Amino acid sequence: MAAASAMAEASSETTSEEGQSIQEPKEANSTKAQKQKRRGCRGSRRRHANRRGDSFGDSFTPYFPRVLKQVHQGLSLSQEAVSVMDSMIHDILDRIATEAGQLAHYTKRVTITSRDIQMAVRLLLPGKMGKLAEAQGTNAALRTSLCAIWQQRK
């Protein structure tokens, strides 16, 4: 019995030594990986810090005065009205994205296409409003793609 316990101790010593030798490189590798991750985060922050419109974040507030000026010159919006409109736009876009995602899921696809977005808009907005929104969105997409093609030709 003493021999069996001595063998058990010897085998536990070798496994603990092996475990220590294995753990040391993992710790060294993990610290290197953590440092690289930290460096990557800092670099990406610097790159995106100079992006235009970054001070507004995910807000549409800078666009409301521009659109209002095109539609009704001389009018202005209160801060409360801007806040309400901003939350409304966020809500509508969230609903469209959710509905388009569900449509893509129903057809067993992982990519949301422009057709999914068109159908989501038609489902969410009633009657003429849906048709008008779809037409405006299609025209905006065409203008954007035509501008991109025009820039490539230059």
From Swiss-Prot:
List the residue ranges of the region (Disordered). 1-61
What is the protein's major site of localization?
A: nucleus
Superkingdom of the source? Eukaryota
UniProt keywords (A-Z) are: Chromosome, DNA-binding, Nucleosome core, Nucleus
Task: Give residue spans, biased composition: Low complexity.
Answer: 1-18
> Could you give a GO molecular-function term held by this entry?
structural constituent of chromatin
Q: Where is the composition biased (Basic residues)?
A: 34-50
Which Pfam family is one of those matched by this entry? Histone
Where does it reside?
Nucleus; Chromosome
Look up keyword Nucleus and say if it applies: yes
**What Gene3D superfamilies does the database record attribute to this sequence?**
Histone, subunit A
Gene Ontology cellular-component terms for this entry are: nucleosome; nucleus
InterPro entries listed in its UniProt record: Histone-fold (IPR009072), Histone_H2A/H2B/H3 (IPR007125), Histone_H2B (IPR000558)
Q: Which residues form a coiled coil?
A: none
User: What's the further remark here?
Assistant: In contrast to other H2B histones, it does not contain the conserved residue in C-terminus that is the target of monoubiquitination.
Role description: Core component of nucleosome. Nucleosomes wrap and compact DNA into chromatin, limiting DNA accessibility to the cellular machineries which require DNA as a template. Histones thereby play a central role in transcription regulation, DNA repair, DNA replication and chromosomal stability. DNA accessibility is regulated via a complex set of post-translational modifications of histones, also called histone code, and nucleosome remodeling.
Q: Which family does it belong to?
A: Belongs to the histone H2B family.
The record's note on quaternary structure and interaction partners says: The nucleosome is a histone octamer containing two molecules each of H2A, H2B, H3 and H4 assembled in one H3-H4 heterotetramer and two H2A-H2B heterodimers. The octamer wraps approximately 147 bp of DNA.
Write the protein's name: Histone H2B type F-M
What is the source species? Answer: Homo sapiens (Human)
Name of the encoding gene: H2BW2
